Swiss-Prot record:
<feature type="region of interest" description="Disordered">
    <location>
        <begin position="43"/>
        <end position="79"/>
    </location>
</feature>
<dbReference type="Pfam" id="PF02416">
    <property type="entry name" value="TatA_B_E"/>
</dbReference>
<feature type="compositionally biased region" description="Low complexity">
    <location>
        <begin position="58"/>
        <end position="67"/>
    </location>
</feature>
<dbReference type="GO" id="GO:0043953">
    <property type="term" value="P:protein transport by the Tat complex"/>
</dbReference>
<feature type="compositionally biased region" description="Basic and acidic residues">
    <location>
        <begin position="46"/>
        <end position="57"/>
    </location>
</feature>
<keyword id="KW-1003">Cell membrane</keyword>
<dbReference type="InterPro" id="IPR003369">
    <property type="entry name" value="TatA/B/E"/>
</dbReference>
<protein>
    <recommendedName>
        <fullName>Sec-independent protein translocase protein TatA</fullName>
    </recommendedName>
</protein>
<dbReference type="GO" id="GO:0008320">
    <property type="term" value="F:protein transmembrane transporter activity"/>
</dbReference>
<keyword id="KW-0812">Transmembrane</keyword>
<keyword id="KW-0813">Transport</keyword>
<keyword id="KW-0472">Membrane</keyword>
<keyword id="KW-0811">Translocation</keyword>
<feature type="compositionally biased region" description="Basic and acidic residues">
    <location>
        <begin position="68"/>
        <end position="79"/>
    </location>
</feature>
<dbReference type="GO" id="GO:0033281">
    <property type="term" value="C:TAT protein transport complex"/>
</dbReference>
<feature type="transmembrane region" description="Helical">
    <location>
        <begin position="1"/>
        <end position="21"/>
    </location>
</feature>
<keyword id="KW-1133">Transmembrane helix</keyword>
């Protein structure tokens, strides 16, 4: 008592199919699937962008660090 049984779920599903029809439910399912796929693609492209930006930032930091390390050596040679 208090829980939803399998029979109650089947009756609700049958009523939904009778009200909307299988074609409309199929197109609704396809639209929902397309929306989920688009959302996943957008999320993965955002992750790719962040990874690319992080990689570029690391390269820039490494280049800057190397340039900074080379400057004191050139100053020592001049003195």
């Amino acid at each position: 008592m208090g829980g939803i049984s399998i029979w109650q779920l089947l009756i609700v599903a049958l009523i939904v199919v009778l009200l909307f029809g299988t074609k409309k439910l199929r197109s609704l399912g396809g639209d929902l699937g397309g929306a989920v796929k688009g959302f996943k693609n957008a999320m993965s492209s955002e992750e790719d962008k962040k990874a690319l930006e992080d990689t570029e930032a690391a390269k820039t930091a490494q280049t800057t660090q190397q340039a900074t390390e080379k400057k004191p050596e050139s100053n020592k040679e001049q003195a």
